Amino acid sequence: VELCKRMLTYDVPSFRAKWNEQHIENINKPAQSMTQLLVEQPITNGKRQIVYLSALFQEKYPETYKRLTDILDKHNVGYALLKATRDIWCRDYMPVQTASGKLIQFKYDPSYLKNNEKYEASRSNVCEVCKANGIKPTFSDINLDGGNVLICGNRAIISDRVFSENPGRKEEDLKAELSRLLEAEIIIIPAQKDDFTGHADGMVRFVNCDTILGNDRAEEFKYWREKMDKVISTYHLQYIDVPFFYGYKDKAHPEHAIGIYVNYLEVENLIVVPVFGVPGNKDAEAVVKIKEIFPDKIVETIDYNEVALEGGLLNCTTWTLNSFQ
């Protein structure tokens, strides 16, 4: 672990291996090896995918866990649990996978977890998690949450929160290093001022490398809409507006994620969309829109509210990996 901690201060040479040789234990189906599990999954564009969740997710939210894994089982999507995690938001502290299959482990030290004893205690140690699960990534000392990285081929979207999280770096130098590590053109989008995480995956998602979907701009703040429109123009992106809603109040959970549909889970040919069922919801509109955007994919819905109240949704709580064949 100490060696791993020291490695966080610089990049080590890239290490790429087929995922089925990395031996992450599949806790859901302990009799199966990871290789056996992946072989049973359908091949999409030469790769297979598997969904990982923190073992704490099953422990803390057993009903929601069952709802999600029942959907995955229904569509023959493999899943497994990650050991040695301290919170359920595995997207943020697990490595980011590039289009070629490399795993890049960024520093996980977000500002929103600092100066709060409760949050500090729940911050997962990336070195411990990687070691416990047999993961051998390339380490970087760039401070960046996985939920703030969206990759499609040779393009990556990251919000400008990455700059304030790395104050000692020049913006252009940081972009260049991210481009090198992620093997992609870096597209910086504006973070939402009222989102304490500043993550890209709560605002937009890739449909393909030239098209993104995102929260309906007509309902967004003017400052964000204008900056986002500039990004769309600069990078020649098509933006598809998806319904969302503000206004749900819960005094015990002021930073909830209820109302955000774009933080869905996408794996293989399946998209799992959260629906909320609360007053003022736009569940039906959002599901219809997502089905229109992805006519060739299966779209399932799920009640994820008990997790959403804690500030995240499906993409936040899953880590989806490709195994290249």
Task: Name each region found by the language model.
Residues 4-6, 10-325:
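The feature marks the mature, well-folded catalytic cores of soluble enzymes
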